[in-house]
Amino acid sequence: MKKQHIINETFLDAILAKKLGTTYTPPKEINDPDFDEAAKHFIDLLLRADGFKPVKTAVVHPIDKESLLGAVRAAQFNVIKPVLIGPQHKIESVAKVNNVDLEDYQVINVEHSHEAAKKAVELAKKREVAAIMKGSLHTDELMSAVVHKENGLRTERRISHAFLMAVATFPKPFIITDAAINIRPTLEDKRDIVQNAIDLMHMIKEDKQVRVAVLSAVETVTSAIPTTLDAAALSKMADRGQITSAIVDGPLAFDNAISLFAAEAKGISSSVSGNADILVVPDLESGNMLAKQLKYLGQAVMAGIVLGARVPIILTSRADPMDMRVISCVLASFIYNHTKAKLHIQAGK
């Protein structure tokens, strides 16, 4: 039987039943599903979050089925505690059609999506929520509120995005960054992008050694390909303590980063080759294409999160399946539960 690479709704039900101590019998056609290693990595991450305190999360403009059910599903796993922000009549209409009981969820009524984004950021600044989740609105609309100079959620770090991915042909989950926020990052931007990803990987990785591959088209440094210069500089910045808590090597071509055989065939000696935890892409275009190629051609399981703001931002798209939405919330839960003592966040109590 072909192995499953998607953590589908039925299996989410089975995991939830296990957490609640109840009995669950899946439909006959998928009885005892045989999941591949990619799905197992994310199932393990979901189960490891058991016992975490749920993250009080502002869900921005959840006026369609996917965004509302994604938040509700994550709440069923006790991963988040949603605060639904948007036109109340539209939220209630979607809930009614999809048999969702809103009694347990706070709903804040605002008229438009941009008001919902602004309200979510306001709640985060007041520490009344500890995460933000994108609903049925454009990413630019949400992020413009997040990065607003006076009223946004900026920190001393550059805001960046990370995809946590798993494929059956690679032995462990890995991060691709930045494939969604920074279009053509400078060297200084990339330093923050790398550090943001390192910090996240330390939160979710049980083996604390983190290895970072800075990607380019080739593994040699040449002025003809400027991204090789950035990669070499980032590697040296790690040597000098400007990037911390990881081994950073670059430039590395993609094959050298993920395959020790490919690296050895080219005479490359690197502790990162074949064992990378983080793949740092040259720019948004290359990263976005790489992530989507792995998803649609390599059957990758993936989740996404925005880092570097005052709170984690769960950034999903309309095409994302339910498992990606739930696991993206799990990433926010890991961040919150690893940092709440330091940040003294009041939300979630």
UniProtKB/Swiss-Prot annotation:
Assigned keywords, A-Z: Acyltransferase, Cytoplasm, Transferase
Chief location bin: cytoplasm
Pathway: Metabolic intermediate biosynthesis; acetyl-CoA biosynthesis; acetyl-CoA from acetate: step 2/2
The EC number(s) this enzyme carries: 2.3.1.8
GO terms under cellular component: cytoplasm
Keyword Nucleotide-binding belongs to the record: no
An example Gene Ontology molecular-function term: phosphate acetyltransferase activity
Enzyme class, UniProt record, top EC level: transferase
GO biological process, one term: acetyl-CoA biosynthetic process
PANTHER family tied to this protein: PHOSPHATE ACETYLTRANSFERASE (PTHR43356:SF2)
Family to which the UniProt record says this protein belongs: Belongs to the phosphate acetyltransferase and butyryltransferase family.
Protein known as: Phosphate acetyltransferase
Organism: Rickettsia felis (strain ATCC VR-1525 / URRWXCal2)
